[in-house]
Amino acid sequence: MPEAIDASSIATNYYKLAHLCSVTYLIYTTNGATNDSTLLELELLIRHSHPKCLVTYYNKYLYYFQFNHVDEHVDLTKEYPQLQLKYSNQVSADLLANPPKVASDKDNHSTGNEYLAYACLSFLKAVKKLVLFNLSRNEAVQLFGNYAVVKEQGLSNFILHIDPILLPNGDLLISISEKCHLQLFDSSIVDISEIEAVDLNFVLYIIPSGIRCHLYDNVNVASNFTTDPPKNSEVLMQLIKYSTGFDLNQLNSLVWVKLVPNLQHLNNQTSKISKFIHPVDNKKFILWPWRLCLLQFGLSEKDTATSPHVLTCDPISLISDFIDFNISHHQQANITGQLNPNHQHNQSFNYSIPSALSTGMSSTGANENKGDLNMVGDIPGSVSDIFGIQSSDTNDFFNGPNFQPAQNPSDVKLDSQEPVKKNSDDEDVEMDDLFGDASEDEKAKTEVSTNELNEEKNFEDLFNDGLNQENQVDESDKVAKSIDEEVLKEESVKSEDLKEDKDLKMQPSSGTIPNTFIDIPKDQMTIPSLKNLKQTPQIYNDPGAPMPVIPTPIFPQFGINSTLPGSAQSVNPPTSAAATDNEANEGARSIFSPILFNPIIKSNIDTKYGKGGKFYVDKEVSAGPDIDSKRKTLRATSVSGFELPSRREDSIGIESITDDNDRRQVFEFPEEQGNERMKDEGHENHAAENDNIIKKMEELEEEDDNDDDDDDDDDDDENEDEDEESDEDDDLNLENNDMNMKRSPPLKLNTLNDPYVAQSNQAVVNFNDSNYNAKQILPNSYNASSMNTGGFSSPASLGFSSSRTNVPPKNDSPFGLNNLAREDRNGTTSPTGDNSDQPTKRQEQSDSPMVVDMEVEKKSTSKEAENTPSGMTTPNSRGSISESSNCLPLILRGVNVASIPTSFILNNVIVSNKISTISTNFDMDVDDETEWSDYELCKNNEMTVKLNNLDEFLKCLGPNLIFDMGLNKLQNSLEMKLSNNERDDEEYDNIEGKAPSRQFENKLCDIFPFCYKVNLNEFTTEAYVNELKGETTTIQDELDNQLSFLDDITNEDILNPKTQLKKLNSIEWDAIYSDSSSNEDNSKKYQGMVHNVGQSSLVNTLEDGTIFPLANDKARVLKHNDTIINLNSIGIKFWKYLNFSPLNGPKNFQLLLISEHDHNMLHHNYNIEFLNSLVYNYKECCFGNISKINLQSSDSRPDMEGIDNGLLMVHKKDEDQVYGNMYKQVNRKLNALVEMIKSDLINKTNKFEFDRPLLLLFINFDKSVNSLLQISKLIRNFKLFLSHHQLPLVEVFAHIIPWSLIIKQSGSQRRLKYLSNFRLSKLSMNLYNQCPNERTIGKPVKDPTKHLFTQLVKEPPSNLNFKFMNNGSNGNGKTTFNDDIFLHLAYERSIDKNWFSAAWSDPLGVVVSTKSWNCSPNLQKTNNKNVHSLESISDEIWTISTALFKKLNDEIIKRTSGLGGKKFLVLTRINSIIPDDELIHWKRLSMKHKDVSLIVLSVNKSPKLLFSGPIGPSQQEDKSNYDPNTNRTSTNMDNSSSTNAANPTCGVGATSNAPDFFKTFGSNNPSPNNNAGSMSISPSNNVGINFHSPQQFLNAPGNFLLPQDFVSSTGGSTNINANPHSNASQYNPDEIIHDPTEELTAVIPKAPLPSFNSPTRLGMKIGYLIKETGVSTHEDTKQYLVYEINLLSCSNYWNLNAIMKILLNQYKKLITLNDILCVGEIDGSITDDRAEKDSNIIPEMTPPLNYTASGLIPWHIAAVTKSLDYLIHIDVEE
């Protein structure tokens, strides 16, 4: 094995700031009554005035710390007379680092020891605040939450974790690491001037607190921004300056944004990640600088929609066929029109609505494209591609000289209608069904014919004479041409208006435009890509309903004067009561149902049905001033194509109630001081009128609530759930305003005094103006995306949705900062939630630190106070903003950044909140909709699942998420869409954090000049542990003191190294007070001594096992089906070549391959080819045999298709861009399969083998994120079908394979990839592991887990313990574990507390299991069995663990014929320490079950790229090993004897070569001679080749049977050093294959370092797994991956060093199980995407960083991480 690492050369992520011997701490309070906010403000002032002052507020006191070696200190009582010294004490660094739990009575200072525990925590907080403030002050970072953000490149920012640590020896360290995945962007990435056109697919966080906020108005987004600062802006900016060191006054034009803080996130709680962008009911808002906002963008699906079938179509032939049909059809139509002139009419109602196929999707209405053939460019991509039409070319073509525009819309009127006589021809009837009636006035019809003839002429010009055979012109063509000349002559005057008509095409056009359509006949549209669509609108044919007035249109008809759906004009009623009947009827028209449904019976029946249904609205319109006259009138039972509110009042805005002048009133944010506020003389009357209207609305709403109780049961339930998840405070319930006036919530924000201001005339900033001072009045702007950061509708446009919102908000806003902005303020609320009485006058606020040295604020505030009205909300104050605001909570309350999800996707947000428009998936089939709801399949890309059968669904989804061979990568299907296309290129999915950049290190060293990076050896020596404790003095130390006279004779540093350690610990220095004269000299002297001590202690670290390599694991396999052999785990990669057999016997099953059949693709036989290859490989690997399922449908069910040769093919239709319809087909066929299985059982045809499990093998062609969810639903439904048909004997398991693994697609061709033996064998291994164990038919499965094809080998005992010798343990606890049973349990709960996932495994792989639960707090109230509480989950976990312990105990009894040892459950919490609500259940269960002992660990989900070291000459030379053309050995044989003598004990698996883990090996090179590590049956000196060990067989040369290859016993290694390129080394029979990616080094620091997840709490012990990477940050350094394992709790049964060493060795085995269980990537080390595309590219031998990192994650940790990373994006619906 390689040599041991040099710990003194490896730099860690710790930086040493100081070495202290003693610290003095002082505790201050204020004079008189303690005011928390005063102390908080004083802390900010002191830190701003003295940046190097260690001060912090904690537990109602102000703590101030002083270093005793520093002479100059700040006297706080002199500078701040408000402070009063309460207590001071000087303590040693050891005592400050580890304070006693209970104060000693013998201590003279026992009265002050009660503060020592607080002083310990306060000291770390003070150091952290000092470091962060100085970094922020120097613009190195920006404060964010409880940490900071650092800018790497461009506009992206990453979280920077900075945690201080005080060691018992006096070392003051800071741990610095950068979080990789959470990416935040500066607010400047969004252009505010174009904010209305931007999809707001992001969430907002404010600096410095990190609190999530929502935009107040998400419809009129621009209205949220203003350049006018709030009245408390000076105080706010001053507070921000004091807290962050950043002065906002230096910015010229500061933009303010109106935000609603997320109160849930303020309490460190995370919103539901599956719908992370959600609306909030909270109306409390703040004005915050836009400069101090960070944005987190959501991930959306990549645009993967392709049309491969276009390549197989001939567009020329399609156009030719179209022209032929067009000519023949219109020849007949023109003759018919001339022979029957009386059937034509001049005026006709707009019956014909263009279909989705002819017009494309457009939400702007249907009439805008009438008479304009340019709408051909709007054809959907599937049609336009088929016809070869490009939009730009189309416009140029139809704008030619021969093209004529449609008739002027003003010439067409709709005053009268005439009956329509349809053509008797069948084709015309079909066209009428498709496009509506084709009857037109004579002029319009002639014009259409003219345009079409011109179109045909242009096509003839394009294709020359290709159509002459069928282009025969008859007399009708001559007549048409004469009419064409007349029309051209008449229309020549209007040529200038053509451009204006075209410009209006994309706008809502008038309803008077003549009715035309693209005359593509239905017969000609039945091409393969269109004939199966169901979007053709049909006339409503209900025999029991009245006759329809007009055919049901497919699109709403909007005129020029109407607006888009969702706007105020489309929702609000008419403003004039004198509207004509015509207008009333227009407003009452429905876009779907033209039927008038007015029930006569209105009594003796339930109100719900008496009104005509849930969507009934009164038709009567009164002319009086009553508010009902202003309501929108809808037809009874009408269904709108757009989302309508559930209540009538929801659609009424204030602009529909007040007059026009009131509606034009402008709402502005408060301007700067000195500006005049806009006033209206009739404002009081206007407000009073509004109050009267509000009262009427309340009365109407109460009546409506009484009437609609039954109608809105479902809506009420949804509202209750939303209220439970809402961020709205309990005190926002304004119905009980009087009762709540005296209550103070934890946080109250500003509330808009008039939240119902008309949104049509919002005052916004003209951001295009450079001075940012001008304002402009913008009309309604509803084109902002509803997918935004807050609610999905404007709070100002919600109308009067509830009676409680009509009451004016409360006045007691706690944000008044000591009454600086308001004089009549009473009371305040501290950030901690405690209420304290405050003086009511400014004269009594002299003790406020914000008043000290703030003359500017005094003057400005006094001027404002004169002109500022009372804070009491009155009708006269509508439109203003309450100016007093307590900004301390938003500045000082740092949110834990762990509550921010690393990513969130937008699938559920887009689908659930998108306006319900008609799409191409529109289907009139009611049964089809019922089918969707029954099967619970998603139509689009949403990630939703029903609550029913959720547990069964998770059982189907879990294995496909975890055991996926690393192929299902979520991030590959997602992308972050930014406005400037900025995104971090480095994406490391398997790396959680990394060391800070070199640029940041340079800034840190500039700010703290004497700090330095700590090397690893400083944590692994005894020099820094317990050196200052007096009780460590021994007899030897006393003897050394007596012999002190020898110092004059000899060098004591050489004779006694402890004297050097004492000198080292006596040196005090710090990097904080750099001005001190002694710091520079002491720091240099200290660092020099540290280097010397580290070099001398390197040998000690190797001897005591602090740093040791981990041995390669061995696996147990069967050879010749009867002999169990042990081999290195790398031999599993050559399973088929070595002819191994599974340890637990063969598993047989039957298979059904489910794949798609695309008739546009060539080479369809790849499915059967792959199936045959898999069946053959599975058999060749001795795993068993696979039978292909063959079932035929019975004669009584001809509708069911049989299954032949194990293939179930689903035909993909051309229009199936989304795979929803395909999943529906699979679901139907799986249901039919169950029926065929039951028929086979009844008929006893015995074609289905009930003694074999059934494998459903899916080839997944869907690239969307929800494809795994959809297929898991299919698997669940199949199991439900089996249960429904009472077929419990059928065992089912499923596996999903991405199509990219086995299929290569190029254009329209697909072929089977070359599948290596390695890949096929891996897939066979995976299927074997997932296949259920063999069982007797009819008996339940007894095994709680499935058998694996192999298991790892348990290490032999290092010594034999005999009971009579009693040497099994020492004084420090047990050190051996051979008889004990370890079961590892890893679990994690999502940060939104909705999902829970766990995985079990023993270190050898005997038992493995995984499971997930839904634990949503909101869904638990439904009492559904599929939702679990934390208590029930804990009980189930313990039950499963008990069953697994029993199986492990049975295995030990089977192997050793003896009883097992003690049971240890290694409880591992991922990404956090165990929270209190979880800890209480584990304590309860551990006390109940005494036979199981808990070992509690805390780990991270992935390693961090933290350590680095230099690249020496030897390492640089090792790079040649990566050259595939060389074949040299990786080590130097000359050093074998010397290094072995220097390192006699290297732990388990020690070899003759000293271990150096970080030397690189080529994967094709053999390892050095290793007699100790070879098999015991292999002789060390063997003449020739010996095949007793498979390891030797793997290294045998290909021509080993030739005579010249048999060499002497010394020929294997004699000439290696003489010629490094010699091939003589390959003849050594004892050489083994070695995989360098499996090499790990374990480090157990002796220093008590804290865990990353709990930086302020020391664990019992910490350990590291270290692995070298091929990535280097600089030319002279290389990087190391670090995986941290923190021991939180265990019994005193163990010695801490021994148990940590055991756990590190077991984690190495759990990492090896990654490959056996197919959890990690199967070929990440050898695959290069570029090499696959270009055969000339040689793949790099250095493995990718993601693959290297995955080799450092235990499989049970990776399983939990994979599960939760997907489950958190799934929304569970009731």
Swiss-Prot record:
Q: Which Pfam families match?
A: Med13_C (PF06333), Med13_N (PF11597), MID_MedPIWI (PF18296)
Q: What cellular-component terms does GO give this entry?
A: mediator complex
Q: What is this protein called?
A: Mediator of RNA polymerase II transcription subunit 13
Question: What is the gene name?
Answer: SSN2
Point to the regions of Low complexity compositional bias: 1525-1543
Keywords (alphabetical) are:
Activator, Coiled coil, Nucleus, Repressor, Transcription, Transcription regulation
Q: What does this protein do?
A: Component of the SRB8-11 complex. The SRB8-11 complex is a regulatory module of the Mediator complex which is itself involved in regulation of basal and activated RNA polymerase II-dependent transcription. The SRB8-11 complex may be involved in the transcriptional repression of a subset of genes regulated by Mediator. It may inhibit the association of the Mediator complex with RNA polymerase II to form the holoenzyme complex.
GO process terms (BP): positive regulation of transcription by RNA polymerase II
Feature: compositional bias, Polar residues: 394-410, 565-579, 827-838, 867-883
InterPro entries, per database record: Med13_C, Mediator_complx_sub13, Mediator_Med13_N, MID_MedPIWI
Q: Where is the composition biased (Basic and acidic residues)?
A: 412-424, 491-505, 674-698, 855-866
**Which one of the record's GO molecular function terms can you name?**
transcription coactivator activity
Places the protein is found: Nucleus
Extent of Acidic residues compositional bias? 425-440, 699-733
Coiled coil region boundaries? 437-506
- Annotated segments matching region Disordered: 394-451, 491-519, 565-584, 670-753, 797-883, 1507-1548
Q: How does it assemble?
A: Component of the SRB8-11 complex, which itself associates with the Mediator complex.
What is the similarity comment for this entry?
Belongs to the Mediator complex subunit 13 family.
